[in-house]
Swiss-Prot record:
PANTHER family: PROTEIN ENHANCER OF SEVENLESS 2B. Its main location: membrane. GO terms for molecular function: epidermal growth factor receptor binding; phosphotyrosine residue binding. Signal peptide: none annotated. GO terms for cellular component: COP9 signalosome; cytoplasm; nucleoplasm; plasma membrane; presynapse. This is GRB2-related adapter protein.
Length: 217
């Protein structure tokens, strides 16, 4: 995940990362502190204040979700090459690429060399964005042709396109959507029986189905 610095920041502690306005930072961990992200810039790593940067989100980044949930989501997307990138549950700051092979979901651990570059095989990249762009036109698999493809546009859920929150919900990771009781959420996907994907006030994320009630608008 990449971000752009909105302001310059001078580190005051040894574990902080200084940067200038306009710098592009690689975000390594967004989960462990609500006010600080761990990031990398030109080979140096450290913590940065989240209100000093703007994330460059992508629909393929799913945050810290489980391997099982990744498989459930991708197998319901009925085309080979559907993919997502998730953060490791056990090792924050490490990532995996999960890819629909048509008959199964394959998981690739994203490796990093001593200089901080990302790689799966021989080719190395400065960011996850570059890695994804490369494997859109080069097969990610060794024994078959599998190219990363964005999700095909899905029709909005029939009839009930909106849901009303019955309880407050606080997101546990960036892939989830927080809301308050009474909020009206636009439902974008219902691919998983337990977790839906929706939009509220410009924010998009997953939320528990049991917390909402479909409504007709």
């Amino acid at each position: 995940m990449e971000s752009v610095a909105l302001y310059s920041f001078q580190a005051t502690e040894s574990d902080e990362l200084a940067f200038n306005k306009g710098d592009t930072l690689k975000i390594l961990n967004m989960e462990d502190d609500q006010n600080w992200y761990k990031a990398e810039l030109r080979g140096a790593e450290g913590f940065v204040p989240k209100n000093y940067i703007r994330l460059k989100p992508h629909p393929w980044y799913s945050g810290r979700i489980s391997r099982q949930l990744a498989e459930e989501i991708l197998m319901k997307r009925n085309h080979q090459g559907a993919f997502l990138i998730r953060e490791s549950e056990s090792s924050p700051g490490e990532f995996s690429v999960s890819v629909n092979y048509g008959d199964q979901v394959q998981h690739f651990k994203v490796l990093r060399d001593p200089s901080g570059k990302y790689y799966l095989w021989e080719e190395k990249f400065n960011s996850l964005n570059e890695l994804v762009a490369f494997y859109r036109t080069t097969t990610i698999a060794k024994k078959r042709q599998v190219f990363l493809q964005d999700e095909e546009p899905l029709p909005k859920p029939p009839r009930a396109c909106f849901a009303q929150a019955q309880f407050d919900f606080s997101a546990q990771d960036p892939s989830q959507l927080s809301f308050r009781r009474g909020d009206i959420i636009e439902v974008l996907e219902r691919l998983d029986p337990s977790w839906w994907r929706g939009r509220l006030s410009g924010r998009i994320g997953f939320f528990p189905r049991s917390y909402v009630q479909p409504v007709h608008m």
